[in-house]
Every structure is written in C-alpha cells, then in structure tokens.
C-alpha cells in the first residue's frame, strides 16, 4: 500500500475528530509546556500546516483525548510525507503513542478503526527501509500495539 493510500485511510478513520475544533490546540499545549496560559483556539493562527506542526510538536503531550485524536491524522500524515527525515513532529507523535495511558485515557479512547490505522502507520514507521524512525516506532509497537506488548494492566 502506498503512503498516499494509508494517509487516506488514516483521515477516514479520524474523520469526525479531524473536522471539529479541538478543545486544546498544539499551540495551547506548547504554551502550557512553557508555564504560560493556553491561548484559545484561533481559526487563523491554529490552521494546521507543516509549519504549525513543526512550531508546536511537543504541545501534543498536553492534549486531552479529544484534542489528541484531532491532531493524530495530521501528525501521521506529516510523518509519512517526511518518513526519511528525523523530526520533532514524528518524535512527539510516536511518544504520544507510548504507554502509560492517562486518566482519562488517550490510547484507550481510540475506536477500533482508529487503532487499526495507528497500527498500520506504526508498522510502516518501524519496518520501512526508508523510515528515519525505525527504532522509536518499533519500541512503541512493542510497548502497546502488538499482542506481545507489555501488559496494559499490570494485573494481567
């Protein structure tokens, strides 16, 4: 499957989330990361572009589940379009897909089609010869996304 087809499938899986305004923006998460108040969503300033994602990648660590699901398809698309390059956007995205999950959960909030899209994305990032992120993506897969992953519940 080409990256173009995978990107289309990712956006289809996240179509509801991608079309709504997020409660928290990447810019807002970045502000919180710098101990500043999160600015409200601004339709002009918070338009998603490569420049926007590159400016605020680590804001993803501050996102609630709804906002996180809003940005996931855009960050996965970016990572696939720039698969041969190391970037903070890809590293922040992959880090956001690692356990432990939060309370309320982000990873466990994904619907089955979204989980499938993420798993297919991670498979490409971990095993494609052109990927600059094979090590981190493989670690993410082994920690949460594969049947042999570290148990999600320590009581397992």
Sequence positions of predicted segments:
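Long, low-complexity, highly charged intrinsically disordered regions
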Residues: 1-59
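Extended alpha-helical scaffolding segments
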Residues: 63, 68-156
